Amino acid sequence: MSSAAPRTPTLLILDGSFGEGCVALLHLDGAAAGRFESAPELRPHQPLVARAAALLPDASSRSQIVAVLVGVGPGSYTGLRAAASLAAGVAAALNIPVIQVPSDRALLLARDASGQTDPVVLPLGVREVLVVDAAGSRIAERSGAPAGADLERIAPHLPAALASTAAEAIDLLRVHEWRTESGREASEIAIRYPAPPRGAEGGVAR
């Protein structure tokens, strides 16, 4: 009888701050920066959960996951909530920690990696956009928003940018051999809204 394949520590990366969102795996299999695997978008507007299921089709693949890395905004209200909900569910089911990453910082890194310099402009609704640049994140009217970087060129670089932003937390977990008290952190995901959702109180993300 052959022995089981050795476990490869893997992070599930989620972000819903813009567009179709980001679903990827980071396999920490000895390579200096790890090996990324992105979920294909099998059809337009496919939910994050379906794309995650495509990356993790069976118990064996899910058993490799040692933590969930989730972008917590600011960005699309609906997308951020979807990513946070999925991250919390996976972490609770597998009893693993959640690493929370500011989406705007990662978006700027991904923009730079794509060779662009324009601000990142994310649609928030019919009239508003979120402008992300070196000065921070702010709400602007669509009609007065600056020209934005090409989001399609940014998207392929986002998994690596999210992981880079979380490098210190990832290294700390690695030192402790991916062991934490539990996955209870999943219930404490704090979404950074750029402005209060309609009908709610809150502030501008800094």
Regions found by a protein language model. Name each.
Residues 52-67:
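Phosphate/pyrophosphate-binding loops at sites that engage ATP/ADP/AMP, CoA/4′-phosphopantetheine
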Residues 54, 88, 92, 113, ...:
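Short, well-ordered alpha-helices that flank and scaffold nucleotide-derived cofactor binding pockets
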Residues 37:
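Phosphate/pyrophosphate-binding betaalpha-module
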Residues 1-32, 41-50, 99-206:
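Oxyanion-binding and handling regions
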Residues 68-97:
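DPxDG-like acidic metal-binding loop motif
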Residues 46, 50-53, 84, 88:
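N-terminal, well-ordered alpha-helical segments
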Residues 59-63, 91-102:
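Phosphate-handling active-site elements
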Residues 67-68, 106:
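Alpha-helical transmembrane segments of multi-pass membrane proteins
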